[in-house]
């Protein structure tokens, strides 16, 4: 929600008026010096939208404010042209409304366009969110990263490395939405206040690493006839892509990282297909390159890669993980009921590479149980299991 500065206004005043933490206001207006506000300057208030209200007989701004449980000044700020003593029946005014509901509806076939639309809605409503593409997919779809937090400890979560594990994307987007709601409404999640976590951590989210693959599983093959025929051939001449894990080039993105890639490659398929083909060499696919570049450019304390399924958490690689990894995975297990497993007896995964090159904690979390793609009817159950892990990843 946008408002215009009046004489005497300050971000401190707006924080008190709208009951929004000052840090969120500062982070929503990063290009503005709070000590040098100018009359007429536009300020963004996070966690609010405006709704239209039509004046009826006997209305006054004071009565409307009382009925909506708002300070009168909040209504005046979003209606700078209105003269309160000259309201007339049928006139339309704007009324601030605090966001207390989710903007993300994850309980549907959640493809790339839905995610991008939800990211746009969240960034509009919560302008302290930062986001930029980290690269493009094979089909030139920008792969977004979202940053939330103001702390020095950098943490990373990612989802939908594998196409038919796309339910991980709406799960992680729903957590982001709930985190935002708790911050702006100053409420708790499972008894935890989110404000301190926001100030201690910066969370990097890549909610869909493999957009082309997700769209293939959900929407079927693209219109391009040559590509469609190639994909069907790679898919064992089937037009049912529900078992497809790879990117649109038929390369498994979680077999693309230089962590004993040669060992994984030796036992995996040698040609493109729906799963397990690791490519001709490590880091040949744009989505894997984008993730590697992002990881090298940040200073992540730890990383969590969300997959499905199995209700397990893999936490080691070749005994290169630091001692704190075991302490952390025990907490993840406590809050989720998931089983910790030190080694998956596999190589070339993102988590493997992170542990190998940084000697820091990395985890692969296998959400839910069943056959991929997990049914959307399992969404609430999976989300409640995952929520404890999302939170623990911030407070540990």
UniProtKB/Swiss-Prot annotation:
One of its GO terms (cellular component) is extracellular space. Its cofactor is Zn(2+). It comes from the Bacteria. Keywords: Cell wall biogenesis/degradation, Hydrolase, Metal-binding, Metalloprotease, Protease, Repeat, Sporulation, Zinc. InterPro entries: ENP1_M14_CPD, LysM_dom, LysM_dom_sf, Peptidase_M14. Belongs to the peptidase M14 family. This is Gamma-D-glutamyl-L-diamino acid endopeptidase 1. It comes from Lysinibacillus sphaericus.
């Amino acid at each position: 929600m946008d408002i215009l500065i009046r004489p005497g206004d300050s971000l401190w005043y707006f924080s008190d008026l709208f009951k929004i933490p000052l840090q969120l206001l500062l982070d929503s207006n990063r290009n503005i010096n709070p000590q040098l506000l100018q009359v007429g300057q536009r300020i963004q208030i996070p966690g609010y939208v405006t709704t239209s209200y039509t004046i009826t007989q006997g209305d006054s701004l004071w009565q409307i404010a009382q009925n909506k449980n708002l300070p009168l000044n909040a209504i005046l700020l979003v209606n700078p042209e209105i003269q309160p003593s000259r309201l007339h029946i049928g006139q339309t005014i704007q009324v601030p409304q605090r966001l207390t509901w989710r903007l993300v509806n994850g309980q549907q076939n959640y493809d790339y366009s839905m995610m991008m639309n939800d990211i746009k809605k969240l960034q509009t409503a919560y302008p302290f969110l930062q986001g930029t593409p980290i690269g493009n997919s094979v089909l030139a779809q920008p792969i977004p990263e979202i940053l939330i937090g103001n702390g020095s400890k950098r943490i990373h979560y990612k989802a939908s490395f594998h196409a038919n594990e796309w339910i991980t994307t709406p799960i992680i987007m729903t957590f982001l939405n709930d985190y935002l709601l708790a911050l702006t409404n100053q409420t708790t999640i499972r008894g935890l206040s989110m404000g301190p976590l926001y100030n201690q951590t910066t969370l990097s989210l890549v909610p869909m690493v493999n957009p082309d693959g997700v769209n293939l599983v959900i929407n079927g093959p693209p219109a391009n006839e040559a590509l469609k025929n190639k994909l069907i051939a790679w898919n064992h001449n089937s037009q049912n892509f529900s078992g497809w894990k790879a990117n649109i080039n038929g390369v498994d993105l979680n077999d693309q990282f230089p962590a004993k890639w040669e060992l994984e490659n030796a036992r995996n398929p040698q040609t493109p297909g729906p799963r397990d083909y690791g490519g001709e060499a490590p880091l040949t696919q744009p989505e894997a390159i984008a993730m590697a570049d992002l990881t090298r450019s940040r200073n992540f304390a730890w990383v969590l890669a969300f997959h499905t399924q199995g209700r397990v958490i893999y936490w080691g690689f070749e005994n290169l993980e630091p001692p704190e990894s075991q302490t952390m995975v025990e907490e993840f297990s406590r809050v989720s009921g998931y089983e910790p497993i030190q080694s998956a007896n596999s190589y070339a995964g993102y988590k493997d590479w992170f542990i190998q090159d940084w000697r820091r904690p990395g985890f692969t979390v296998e959400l839910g149980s069943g056959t991929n793609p997990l049914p959307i009817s399992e969404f609430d159950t999976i989300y409640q299991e995952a929520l404890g892990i999302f939170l623990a990843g911030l407070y540990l």
